[in-house]
């Protein structure tokens, strides 16, 4: 029962942090110090990635009409715009496949530590504040996904590669990149959500494949633990996405920047104290 409760808490953390630009990894590094599943490391590593499937499904459910090119309620123009949106998303994910996929395991092996995570939290927190201050009196060049050029989509996809560095935040890197290029906050957030679908779905499937291909099995309650994490992640991510979309209608991302800086300092302070 305790392991199920831990899965609920980890699902909540994943659901809240996956689409807010605050780094799910940064939070899991801290949470892992206090709430660690009493399971083999191989299962825990797989669990931490695969619970993202719940967050992905939250995007699919929330945006099902917008993302469905076969909807009978859409006009021919709207169906064409939906197909074009998917083309932009697929093009944007290419840099992660070409560059990110080969580097992923190396990054996890060499950079997955509290110091890298905390530095990334702080650096990107500062960047959010600086860029928002710079853009506060500027009109966005792209205020609709329909007007977003393919070259801008692929540039945003290039920013996603930065999220290979633990603590960066996939949504943080893509939203920051999109705003820097000149999109509105709303377009930046939505495109980041859509870009997550192939990116995170692919990452989750790859992790599952590696888990089972290397002899992993779901023993005891592990299947239930994984299912609970995915379901909780879905419910919380759904609420988190709705919150963010409502928030950025009237506010900017500076609060998230300050939050990242504070969290980064807390991570450094906590592990520095542990070392002594």
Curated annotation (Swiss-Prot):
Pfam families: BacA
GO molecular function: undecaprenyl-diphosphatase activity
Principal EC category: hydrolase
Topology relative to the membrane: Multi-pass membrane protein
UniProt keyword annotations, A-Z: Antibiotic resistance, Cell membrane, Cell shape, Cell wall biogenesis/degradation, Hydrolase, Membrane, Peptidoglycan synthesis, Transmembrane, Transmembrane helix
Subcellular location: Cell membrane
Annotated InterPro entries: UppP
EC number: 3.6.1.27
GO CC list: plasma membrane
Any one GO biological process: regulation of cell shape
PANTHER family: UNDECAPRENYL-DIPHOSPHATASE
Family as reported in the entry's similarity comment: Belongs to the UppP family.
HAMAP family documented for this protein: Undec_diphosphatase
Protein name: Undecaprenyl-diphosphatase
